[in-house]
Amino acid sequence: MWRLRVAEGGGDPWLRTKNGHVGRQVWEFDPAAGDPDELAAVEAARRGFAARRHELKHSSDLLMRMQFAKANPLKLDIPAIKLEEHEAVTGEAVLSSLKRAIARYSTFQAHDGHWPGDYGGPMFLMPGLIITLYVSGALNTALSSEHQKEIRRYLYNHQNEDGGWGLHIEGHSTMFGSALTYVSLRLLGEGPDSGDGAMEKGRKWILDHGGATYITSWGKFWLSVLGVFDWSGNNPVPPEIWLLPYFLPIHPGRMWCHCRMVYLPMCYIYGKRFVGPVTPIILELRKELYEVPYNEVDWDKARNLCAKEDLYYPHPFVQDVLWATLHKFVEPAMLRWPGNKLREKALDTVMQHIHYEDENTRYICIGPVNKVLNMLACWIEDPNSEAFKLHIPRVHDYLWIAEDGMKMQGYNGSQLWDTAFTVQAIVATGLIEEFGPTLKLAHGYIKKTQVIDDCPGDLSQWYRHISKGAWPFSTADHGWPISDCTAEGLKAALLLSKISPDIVGEAVEVNRLYDSVNCLMSYMNDNGGFATYELTRSYAWLELINPAETFGDIVIDYPYVECTSAAIQALTAFKKLYPGHRKSEIDNCISKAASFIEGIQKSDGSWYGSWAVCFTYGTWFGVKGLVAAGRTFKNSPAIRKACDFLLSKELPSGGWGESYLSSQDQVYTNLEGKRPHAVNTGWAMLALIDAGQAERDPIPLHRAAKVLINLQSEDGEFPQQEIIGVFNKNCMISYSEYRNIFPIWALGEYRRRVLAADK
């Protein structure tokens, strides 16, 4: 039976940590664990998901819930409430709902203070890991037979009815998702006709849509590594770009760090033209993936082919000219003397940057894509290297299992992010003493996860921003600082500092708060906006050379309403408690940031949310940031327009329910059937409450509160509904804790600020 292990290293000599592995979450298989009833419950959950997999594509994290239910048994003695259409929402009903929800949600808190959960969703992550482990000969070393079995389960479970696989679990079939998933299943031991016809259906989808030559550029890269696509069918990824002077706008050090850190090892692997061993499976795949014999494929033509199902960001003409020039003239010169000397120097430079990233994230790396690419680059450099051995155990930091199988997550978790939001949600309910132990544990996690040092060496040499005082998205061992994570961590720390330490523990030291404020203010761009990990270092026109057909806005670190709003909120909260610290700088920062938020509001009153679905999320941040900066409904046209927008989207039944298509198409789209979503409803309620909606017309808030109460399950939780996170406009990702955090937060604010106002 599978067991979740939290904050453990297992005595592995190849694991490094800064803080005793706080936040680490790893699933292990114990063949002796589980009694017959537990094993039967797990199998029932798996069958249940498989039976409904085309209707409900998101797991409910039932394996984790079963484990916590056994470890932290809870008998709810508060009756569940369902309100009839004619019934009004009462304070008693809301209080009952909140107590039941927080009591249940608290049982899922790990002993180190964070809330573990599924952060999966993208389907293109696991194939990179499988291919890397296969070509390096480490597949069976890194992944047990049970791991491989659960990965196969996951890949089969998320096959679409047409036979293909999507970019993410709720997406339509794409060549990127289909070809890579099919290949992964073959490498994991599935035959061409396995899976009760599933493999045959998958292969048919691939061939019916032109074959693997139509896969996206990232897919071409992975298939070339494996040996089932020729490197000449790839547009160049020249490592020499790392030798350019930094003042050039196209220098990779000026790019968004996720883009930079993915193309960094890609440069190395492309520069080496590495191809894995040609095994019998590879020869079979060369026959299975193409409409014509492998030796007859037109690789030059294949360079720019992309299936229409995958094409979110079509290449502009300038890109076609650039790739053709590099392919036909520059690359041939780099493969012979004297160009090959320059290539060797470039590859050496790239490898230095790869090692710096690995060492400063304890071999977790910034994300799952560069994690496996860096691991492969280390193996290519030296198959017996210490670096490769240090990479292997960190593979498990990215793997998560639920009733749908084992997936690769979009990060090593969302630990700090979810914990900071949870603290704010529980404090908003006013039930602080009742849930003091929960807050105290969470406080401990927040304190232990703050980044206390900058990365070593000359930061400019490694193109790194300062880190000291920041909070990361997940764990201190990961350590990459992020503006909004720093802001949310700081907000949570400040809230907890106002509560008796007898209840929540000792507050974060003042000097560490000062460090956090210093780091946070360092993120402000000249236009007042805040980007994610770093300042915006180059120009938006660089998006013209975005080679990833599947994603939008990846080349530079753009400023976002979410990051900017979070910074305003944190600085405002800090200023109230420490009014004398850098007062004029903080005031100027808040003023410029608020103007930036007003400047990017859409004409309909909304803000586009870039990190969750979508306009309800962005508009919550827009409103909350402006209110924190001192704007009100009366003095701010932007807030008035935002309220009009949100009220216009409330469903006839009450509540809000926004589809991921809003993110993809950038047009507000309701869920199919105009169903409410608990998380969207929570965001909209929080925005309207902050904007003073209760003083004008509380009825929309009463209706929304009733929706949330009636969505609540018998066990106190809110349901897992459609996927709610997003990145780069087109790929969805799971934020599994949101289902409980935001209904709790919204009902808490509603109870304190709407119902109390009515009295």
Swiss-Prot record:
GO terms for biological process: triterpenoid biosynthetic process. GO terms for cellular component: lipid droplet. It is an enzyme of class 5 (isomerase). GO terms for molecular function: cycloartenol synthase activity. Pfam families: SQHop_cyclase_C, SQHop_cyclase_N. InterPro entries: SQ_cyclase_C (IPR032696), SQ_cyclase_N (IPR032697), Squalene_cyclase (IPR018333), Terpene_synthase_CS (IPR002365), Terpenoid_cyclase/PrenylTrfase (IPR008930). The active site is at residue 484. The keyword Oxidoreductase does not apply. It comes from the Eukaryota. It catalyses: (S)-2,3-epoxysqualene = cycloartenol. The keyword Isomerase applies. PFTB repeats lie at residues 148-189, 513-558, 590-630, 639-680. Keywords: Isomerase, Repeat. SUPFAM superfamilies: Terpenoid cyclases/Protein prenyltransferases. CDD domains: SQCY_1. Coiled coil: none annotated. Its EC number is 5.4.99.8. Belongs to the terpene cyclase/mutase family. PANTHER family: LANOSTEROL SYNTHASE (PTHR11764:SF20), TERPENE CYCLASE/MUTASE FAMILY MEMBER (PTHR11764). Converts oxidosqualene ((3S)-2,3-epoxy-2,3-dihydrosqualene) to cycloartenol. This is Cycloartenol synthase. It comes from Oryza sativa subsp. japonica (Rice).
